[in-house]
Swiss-Prot record:
GO BP term (any one): rRNA base methylation
Catalytic activity: cytidine(1402) in 16S rRNA + S-adenosyl-L-methionine = N(4)-methylcytidine(1402) in 16S rRNA + S-adenosyl-L-homocysteine + H(+)
SUPFAM superfamilies to which the protein is assigned, alphabetical: Putative methyltransferase TM0872, insert domain (SSF81799), S-adenosyl-L-methionine-dependent methyltransferases (SSF53335)
Stored PANTHER family: 12S RRNA N4-METHYLCYTIDINE METHYLTRANSFERASE, S-ADENOSYL-METHYLTRANSFERASE MRAW
Name of the molecule in the record: Ribosomal RNA small subunit methyltransferase H
Protein backbone atom coordinates (compact mmCIF):
# COMPACT_ATOMS: atom_id res chain seq x y z
CA UNK A 1 0.00 0.00 0.00
CA UNK A 2 1.52 3.29 -1.07
CA UNK A 3 1.62 5.96 1.58
CA UNK A 4 -0.46 9.00 0.73
CA UNK A 5 0.97 12.52 0.69
CA UNK A 6 1.45 14.43 3.89
CA UNK A 7 -1.14 17.24 4.09
CA UNK A 8 0.54 20.60 3.68
CA UNK A 9 3.79 19.11 2.38
CA UNK A 10 3.93 21.10 -0.85
CA UNK A 11 6.88 20.31 -3.11
CA UNK A 12 9.92 22.30 -2.07
CA UNK A 13 10.84 23.28 -5.67
CA UNK A 14 7.43 24.96 -6.03
CA UNK A 15 8.32 28.21 -4.28
CA UNK A 16 5.53 30.32 -5.75
CA UNK A 17 2.55 30.52 -3.40
CA UNK A 18 -0.55 31.53 -5.37
CA UNK A 19 -3.15 33.90 -3.99
CA UNK A 20 -5.67 32.24 -1.66
CA UNK A 21 -3.94 28.88 -2.08
CA UNK A 22 -5.17 27.32 1.16
CA UNK A 23 -8.67 28.70 0.66
CA UNK A 24 -8.84 27.17 -2.84
CA UNK A 25 -7.74 23.78 -1.48
CA UNK A 26 -10.33 24.02 1.31
CA UNK A 27 -13.05 24.92 -1.21
CA UNK A 28 -12.24 21.93 -3.44
CA UNK A 29 -11.96 19.59 -0.42
CA UNK A 30 -9.75 17.01 -2.19
CA UNK A 31 -10.10 13.39 -1.15
CA UNK A 32 -8.12 10.27 -1.95
CA UNK A 33 -8.96 9.05 -5.45
CA UNK A 34 -10.43 12.37 -6.59
CA UNK A 35 -9.88 13.61 -10.14
CA UNK A 36 -9.16 17.35 -10.15
CA UNK A 37 -8.47 19.98 -12.80
CA UNK A 38 -6.18 22.99 -12.47
CA UNK A 39 -7.34 24.93 -15.50
CA UNK A 40 -4.70 27.66 -15.15
CA UNK A 41 -1.49 25.87 -14.11
CA UNK A 42 0.79 28.95 -14.26
CA UNK A 43 3.58 28.46 -11.74
CA UNK A 44 1.98 25.29 -10.39
CA UNK A 45 1.15 26.50 -6.90
CA UNK A 46 -2.43 25.25 -6.79
CA UNK A 47 -1.54 21.93 -8.40
CA UNK A 48 1.30 21.31 -5.95
CA UNK A 49 -0.98 22.10 -3.01
CA UNK A 50 -3.72 19.80 -4.31
CA UNK A 51 -1.27 16.94 -4.84
CA UNK A 52 -0.02 17.44 -1.28
CA UNK A 53 -3.50 17.49 0.23
CA UNK A 54 -4.73 14.02 -0.77
CA UNK A 55 -3.89 10.98 -2.90
CA UNK A 56 -5.69 12.55 -5.85
CA UNK A 57 -4.84 12.98 -9.52
CA UNK A 58 -4.63 16.37 -11.21
CA UNK A 59 -5.06 17.34 -14.85
CA UNK A 60 -3.34 20.70 -15.38
CA UNK A 61 -4.03 22.95 -18.36
CA UNK A 62 -2.14 25.98 -19.66
CA UNK A 63 -1.56 27.65 -23.02
CA UNK A 64 1.78 29.16 -22.00
CA UNK A 65 4.71 27.03 -23.24
CA UNK A 66 6.80 28.03 -20.20
CA UNK A 67 4.02 26.93 -17.84
CA UNK A 68 3.61 23.63 -19.67
CA UNK A 69 7.35 22.99 -19.29
CA UNK A 70 7.10 23.70 -15.55
CA UNK A 71 4.16 21.33 -15.39
CA UNK A 72 6.07 18.49 -16.99
CA UNK A 73 8.88 19.00 -14.46
CA UNK A 74 6.38 18.75 -11.59
CA UNK A 75 4.69 15.73 -13.18
CA UNK A 76 8.03 13.89 -13.21
CA UNK A 77 8.00 14.10 -9.41
CA UNK A 78 4.45 12.72 -9.24
CA UNK A 79 4.35 9.71 -11.60
CA UNK A 80 0.82 8.79 -12.55
CA UNK A 81 -0.77 11.61 -10.55
CA UNK A 82 -0.26 14.71 -12.72
CA UNK A 83 -0.92 15.13 -16.43
CA UNK A 84 -0.22 18.46 -18.14
CA UNK A 85 -2.21 19.51 -21.20
CA UNK A 86 -1.30 22.30 -23.63
CA UNK A 87 -4.40 24.38 -24.27
CA UNK A 88 -6.96 26.76 -22.81
CA UNK A 89 -9.31 26.02 -19.93
CA UNK A 90 -12.25 27.09 -22.08
CA UNK A 91 -11.54 23.94 -24.11
CA UNK A 92 -11.01 21.70 -21.07
CA UNK A 93 -13.96 19.48 -21.97
CA UNK A 94 -12.47 18.38 -25.29
CA UNK A 95 -8.90 18.29 -23.91
CA UNK A 96 -9.95 15.92 -21.14
CA UNK A 97 -12.27 13.86 -23.36
CA UNK A 98 -9.29 13.08 -25.60
CA UNK A 99 -7.85 11.23 -22.58
CA UNK A 100 -11.10 9.52 -21.63
CA UNK A 101 -11.99 11.93 -18.81
CA UNK A 102 -15.65 12.98 -18.88
CA UNK A 103 -16.33 13.62 -15.17
CA UNK A 104 -14.18 15.32 -12.53
CA UNK A 105 -14.48 16.06 -8.82
CA UNK A 106 -13.04 19.56 -8.68
CA UNK A 107 -11.91 22.43 -10.90
CA UNK A 108 -9.69 25.36 -9.91
CA UNK A 109 -9.39 28.48 -12.09
CA UNK A 110 -7.07 31.41 -11.37
CA UNK A 111 -8.13 34.05 -13.88
CA UNK A 112 -5.75 36.50 -15.51
CA UNK A 113 -2.01 36.77 -15.90
CA UNK A 114 0.39 34.71 -13.76
CA UNK A 115 3.28 36.07 -11.69
CA UNK A 116 5.93 34.46 -13.95
CA UNK A 117 4.32 36.14 -16.96
CA UNK A 118 4.19 39.55 -15.27
CA UNK A 119 7.78 39.32 -14.06
CA UNK A 120 9.25 38.30 -17.44
CA UNK A 121 9.95 41.49 -19.44
CA UNK A 122 10.06 39.53 -22.70
CA UNK A 123 6.35 38.69 -22.35
CA UNK A 124 5.34 42.35 -22.45
CA UNK A 125 2.69 42.28 -19.72
CA UNK A 126 4.16 44.82 -17.32
CA UNK A 127 4.58 48.59 -17.49
CA UNK A 128 7.36 48.30 -14.89
CA UNK A 129 9.86 46.70 -17.28
CA UNK A 130 10.95 47.48 -20.82
CA UNK A 131 9.97 44.72 -23.20
CA UNK A 132 8.22 43.97 -26.48
CA UNK A 133 4.56 44.97 -26.47
CA UNK A 134 3.26 41.41 -26.72
CA UNK A 135 0.91 40.31 -23.87
CA UNK A 136 0.00 36.94 -25.38
CA UNK A 137 -0.44 34.15 -22.85
CA UNK A 138 0.28 31.66 -25.61
CA UNK A 139 2.56 31.86 -28.62
CA UNK A 140 0.02 32.60 -31.35
CA UNK A 141 -2.39 35.35 -32.30
CA UNK A 142 -2.70 39.11 -32.13
CA UNK A 143 -0.28 41.05 -29.92
CA UNK A 144 -0.87 44.25 -27.99
CA UNK A 145 1.40 46.01 -30.49
CA UNK A 146 -0.90 44.88 -33.30
CA UNK A 147 -3.86 46.48 -31.54
CA UNK A 148 -2.28 49.84 -30.71
CA UNK A 149 -0.69 50.21 -34.14
CA UNK A 150 -3.42 48.85 -36.41
CA UNK A 151 -6.84 49.47 -34.83
CA UNK A 152 -8.58 52.80 -35.36
CA UNK A 153 -8.94 55.35 -32.58
CA UNK A 154 -12.57 54.51 -31.80
CA UNK A 155 -11.84 50.80 -31.44
CA UNK A 156 -8.83 51.41 -29.18
CA UNK A 157 -10.95 53.70 -27.00
CA UNK A 158 -13.66 51.06 -26.82
CA UNK A 159 -11.17 48.35 -25.76
CA UNK A 160 -9.62 50.57 -23.08
CA UNK A 161 -13.04 51.54 -21.73
CA UNK A 162 -14.72 48.13 -21.96
CA UNK A 163 -11.89 45.98 -20.58
CA UNK A 164 -10.03 48.51 -18.45
CA UNK A 165 -12.93 50.66 -17.27
CA UNK A 166 -10.61 53.59 -17.91
CA UNK A 167 -12.69 56.79 -17.87
CA UNK A 168 -9.97 58.58 -19.86
CA UNK A 169 -10.11 55.97 -22.64
CA UNK A 170 -10.67 58.53 -25.42
CA UNK A 171 -7.65 60.55 -24.32
CA UNK A 172 -5.58 57.36 -24.25
CA UNK A 173 -6.69 56.32 -27.74
CA UNK A 174 -6.07 59.81 -29.12
CA UNK A 175 -2.56 59.89 -27.66
CA UNK A 176 -1.74 56.42 -29.00
CA UNK A 177 -2.84 57.31 -32.52
CA UNK A 178 -0.91 60.59 -32.43
CA UNK A 179 2.29 58.86 -31.28
CA UNK A 180 2.10 56.01 -33.78
CA UNK A 181 2.02 58.54 -36.62
CA UNK A 182 5.62 59.31 -35.66
CA UNK A 183 6.74 55.69 -35.27
CA UNK A 184 5.19 52.30 -34.40
CA UNK A 185 4.66 51.69 -30.68
CA UNK A 186 6.49 48.45 -29.94
CA UNK A 187 7.78 48.66 -26.35
CA UNK A 188 5.96 48.45 -23.03
CA UNK A 189 7.64 51.49 -21.50
CA UNK A 190 6.81 53.59 -24.55
CA UNK A 191 3.12 52.75 -24.20
CA UNK A 192 3.21 53.35 -20.45
CA UNK A 193 4.74 56.79 -21.00
CA UNK A 194 2.04 57.67 -23.56
CA UNK A 195 -0.74 56.69 -21.16
CA UNK A 196 0.81 58.49 -18.20
CA UNK A 197 1.01 61.67 -20.26
CA UNK A 198 -2.79 61.86 -20.53
CA UNK A 199 -4.14 59.98 -17.49
CA UNK A 200 -3.78 61.80 -14.15
CA UNK A 201 -2.32 60.05 -11.13
CA UNK A 202 -4.88 58.55 -8.79
CA UNK A 203 -5.06 59.18 -5.06
CA UNK A 204 -4.64 55.47 -4.31
CA UNK A 205 -1.20 55.37 -5.91
CA UNK A 206 -2.12 52.94 -8.69
CA UNK A 207 -0.06 53.59 -11.82
CA UNK A 208 -2.05 55.49 -14.50
CA UNK A 209 -1.07 52.84 -17.07
CA UNK A 210 -2.66 49.99 -15.09
CA UNK A 211 -6.12 50.04 -16.64
CA UNK A 212 -4.90 50.41 -20.21
CA UNK A 213 -2.46 47.51 -19.86
CA UNK A 214 -5.22 45.39 -18.30
CA UNK A 215 -7.57 46.22 -21.16
CA UNK A 216 -5.09 45.31 -23.87
CA UNK A 217 -4.17 42.05 -22.13
CA UNK A 218 -7.82 41.03 -21.83
CA UNK A 219 -8.45 41.87 -25.49
CA UNK A 220 -5.34 40.05 -26.74
CA UNK A 221 -6.22 36.85 -24.88
CA UNK A 222 -10.04 37.02 -25.06
CA UNK A 223 -10.00 36.51 -21.31
CA UNK A 224 -13.67 37.21 -20.60
CA UNK A 225 -14.82 34.96 -23.44
CA UNK A 226 -12.44 32.28 -22.19
CA UNK A 227 -13.87 32.63 -18.69
CA UNK A 228 -17.45 32.23 -19.91
CA UNK A 229 -16.51 29.12 -21.90
CA UNK A 230 -14.62 27.70 -18.93
CA UNK A 231 -17.52 28.15 -16.52
CA UNK A 232 -19.92 26.45 -18.91
CA UNK A 233 -17.46 23.58 -19.41
CA UNK A 234 -17.06 23.20 -15.64
CA UNK A 235 -20.83 22.88 -15.25
CA UNK A 236 -20.85 20.00 -17.74
CA UNK A 237 -17.73 18.26 -16.39
CA UNK A 238 -18.27 18.32 -12.64
CA UNK A 239 -19.83 15.25 -11.06
CA UNK A 240 -22.59 15.76 -8.48
CA UNK A 241 -20.87 16.97 -5.32
CA UNK A 242 -17.88 18.22 -7.32
CA UNK A 243 -16.50 21.64 -6.46
CA UNK A 244 -15.63 24.71 -8.55
CA UNK A 245 -13.23 27.35 -7.19
CA UNK A 246 -12.52 30.52 -9.20
CA UNK A 247 -10.09 33.27 -8.19
CA UNK A 248 -10.52 36.64 -9.92
CA UNK A 249 -8.53 39.87 -9.68
CA UNK A 250 -10.77 42.63 -10.99
CA UNK A 251 -14.42 43.56 -11.17
CA UNK A 252 -14.97 42.48 -14.79
CA UNK A 253 -13.90 38.90 -14.09
CA UNK A 254 -15.68 38.75 -10.76
CA UNK A 255 -18.90 40.02 -12.33
CA UNK A 256 -18.88 37.19 -14.87
CA UNK A 257 -18.29 34.54 -12.19
CA UNK A 258 -20.78 36.06 -9.75
CA UNK A 259 -23.54 36.25 -12.35
CA UNK A 260 -22.88 32.71 -13.61
CA UNK A 261 -23.02 31.21 -10.12
CA UNK A 262 -26.01 33.36 -9.15
CA UNK A 263 -27.97 32.15 -12.16
CA UNK A 264 -26.93 28.53 -11.71
CA UNK A 265 -27.60 28.40 -7.97
CA UNK A 266 -31.20 29.58 -8.21
CA UNK A 267 -34.26 28.02 -9.82
CA UNK A 268 -35.91 29.94 -12.64
CA UNK A 269 -38.19 32.64 -11.16
CA UNK A 270 -41.94 32.45 -11.50
CA UNK A 271 -43.44 34.79 -14.13
CA UNK A 272 -45.46 36.40 -11.32
CA UNK A 273 -45.33 36.33 -7.54
CA UNK A 274 -48.90 35.04 -7.66
CA UNK A 275 -47.99 32.08 -9.87
CA UNK A 276 -45.72 29.08 -9.27
CA UNK A 277 -42.51 28.62 -11.23
CA UNK A 278 -42.96 26.76 -14.54
CA UNK A 279 -42.94 22.98 -14.15
CA UNK A 280 -40.15 22.70 -16.71
CA UNK A 281 -37.97 25.39 -15.09
CA UNK A 282 -34.33 24.23 -14.90
CA UNK A 283 -33.22 23.19 -11.42
CA UNK A 284 -30.17 24.80 -9.78
CA UNK A 285 -26.93 23.22 -10.98
CA UNK A 286 -24.73 24.68 -8.23
CA UNK A 287 -24.92 25.35 -4.50
CA UNK A 288 -22.91 28.35 -3.35
CA UNK A 289 -20.25 27.60 -0.74
CA UNK A 290 -19.54 31.19 0.34
CA UNK A 291 -22.22 33.56 -0.94
CA UNK A 292 -20.10 36.71 -0.92
CA UNK A 293 -16.84 35.05 -1.85
CA UNK A 294 -13.57 34.95 0.09
CA UNK A 295 -10.86 37.62 0.08
CA UNK A 296 -7.25 37.38 1.32
CA UNK A 297 -6.53 37.69 5.03
CA UNK A 298 -4.46 40.69 6.24
CA UNK A 299 -1.36 38.50 6.62
CA UNK A 300 -1.52 37.44 2.97
CA UNK A 301 -2.06 41.02 1.82
CA UNK A 302 0.99 42.13 3.79
CA UNK A 303 3.11 39.38 2.23
CA UNK A 304 1.74 39.75 -1.30
CA UNK A 305 0.38 43.17 -2.38
CA UNK A 306 -0.76 41.65 -5.70
CA UNK A 307 -3.46 39.83 -3.75
CA UNK A 308 -5.27 43.06 -2.82
CA UNK A 309 -8.06 42.71 -5.38
CA UNK A 310 -8.38 38.91 -5.36
CA UNK A 311 -11.68 37.19 -4.62
CA UNK A 312 -12.47 33.48 -4.48
CA UNK A 313 -15.94 32.28 -5.41
CA UNK A 314 -16.77 28.61 -5.05
CA UNK A 315 -19.74 26.32 -5.48
CA UNK A 316 -20.71 22.66 -5.34
CA UNK A 317 -22.31 20.89 -8.29
CA UNK A 318 -25.79 19.48 -7.79
CA UNK A 319 -27.22 16.49 -9.66
CA UNK A 320 -29.34 18.69 -11.97
CA UNK A 321 -28.56 18.52 -15.70
CA UNK A 322 -26.26 21.24 -17.04
CA UNK A 323 -28.13 24.21 -18.46
CA UNK A 324 -28.34 24.68 -22.19
CA UNK A 325 -27.56 28.00 -23.83
CA UNK A 326 -30.69 30.10 -23.63
CA UNK A 327 -32.10 28.37 -20.54
CA UNK A 328 -33.62 30.78 -18.05
CA UNK A 329 -31.56 31.69 -15.02
Amino acid sequence: MTAGPTPGAVDAPSLHIPVLRDEVVDALAPRDGAVLVDGTFGAGGYTAALLASAACTVWAIDRDPAAVARGHALAARHPGRLTVLDGTFGCMESLLAAHGITRVDGIALDIGVSSPQIDDPSRGFSFRFDGPLDMRMGSHGTTAADIVNERDEAEIADIVWRYGEERHSRRVARAIVARRREAPITRTLDLAEIVRSVVPKSKDGIDPATRTFQALRIAVNDELGELERGLAAAERLLAPGGRLAVVTFHSLEDRVVKEFLRSRSAAAPAPSRHLPAPADAPAPTFRLIARSGVTPAPAELAANPRARSARLRSAERTSAPARRLGDAA
